[in-house]
Amino acid sequence: QNLFTMKKIFKIFAVLLILALVYLRIEIYPQLDLISGFSAKSVASGHFIDGRTLETIQQGDNDIDKVDWATNEINEAERFVTSKVHGLKERKAIYREGLGATLINDDFDISKPYNVPKRNKINNNLPFPYGNLEPKDTVFSNIDYQKLNAVVENAFDKKGQKDKRTRSVIVIYKDKIIAEKYADGFNKNSKILGWSMTKSLTATYFGILQKQGKFYIMKPAPIAEWKNDERSKITTNDLLHMNSGLDWEEDYGKIS
């Protein structure tokens, strides 16, 4: 009787184990490539571009579900990051001056020469927002600064919390900075991942230019390389939507 019971328990255990392995192979294993890839790119950008440590990136950026499975290593000499999940699906992200951090595959030739965009940064001696100098101190009588500062303070997590994860808040009124605050480890020179906020601000600036009559977003995008093929039909409005046209579901809990 005991032998029969043990055999039955063993069979049940074996079936459950097989089901678990099948689930891991079908549902989880394909995600490992994305997890290690995301982690490698995140660490490379945060470390080589913003100068943050691996520890702070792992605790403040990559401490999200599944991404925290990854193990990351930084190669300072050759400026790249490798990430893998329990030894599986290793991915590499490289840093190149002028291009930033790029996730690469096994066929990528790191030694291959590359072109760097020519970016001309013009500095002038005017105060913010018209130049690079510090803004002039201005106090507005119609602003309740105590209430404003309380609102800004409330945008950040209290010590030990990770609910809001706000990195920075800046409030501008009549071209003057009236409130400014940063999370620990960040300052006005930090290079912060913008996500969709970058897209929203870019679209806002083009909207202002359109209202001022200085730009028309429904015209073909002013890109010389696109003028003689089907891309000539792509407008600035299309680009501002940042939509690839691919059919996909924006669900970060599974593969789209």
Q: What are these language model-derived features?
A:
Residues Q1-T5:
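Short, Lys/Arg-enriched N-terminal segments with co-localized hydrophobic residues
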Residues K11-R25:
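Hydrophobic membrane-insertion alpha-helices, especially the h-region
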Residues P30-R52:
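Alpha-helical transmembrane signal-anchor/signal-peptide segments
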Residues G37, I49-R91, R96, I104-F108:
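Membrane-embedded, hydrophobic transmembrane alpha-helices
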Residues S83, N149-F186:
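A short, well-structured edge-of-sheet supersecondary motif
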Residues V85-Q161:
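Non-catalytic propeptide/linker segments at domain boundaries
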Residues D175, I192-M218, L239:
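Active-site SXXK
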Residues K211-D247, D251:
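Active-site helix/loop module of the DD-peptidase/beta-lactamase fold
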